[in-house]
């Protein structure tokens, strides 16, 4: 944190949301892989259908992914794919 109190700090909610989405997807991906599933196929199934049973309960992955809205996940994935900030 800056010691200069003359300047106003800015909080970037978009970067926070992006970091949270990445952290959750990484954790879910790892959990799916550890259980022997194809993580990409399972995540695509979940994103298309909204059915959380595509995601394993292992390591709390299902509960984690449900903390995010599917449209927000897709938004972050597309921005990352197209390298749009």
UniProtKB/Swiss-Prot annotation:
Superkingdom of source: Bacteria
Alphabetized HAMAP family for the sequence: UPF0297
PANTHER family: UPF0297 PROTEIN YRZL (PTHR40067:SF1)
Pfam families in alphabetical order: IreB
InterPro entries: IreB
Family named by the database record: Belongs to the UPF0297 family.
Official protein name in the record: UPF0297 protein CLL_A1175
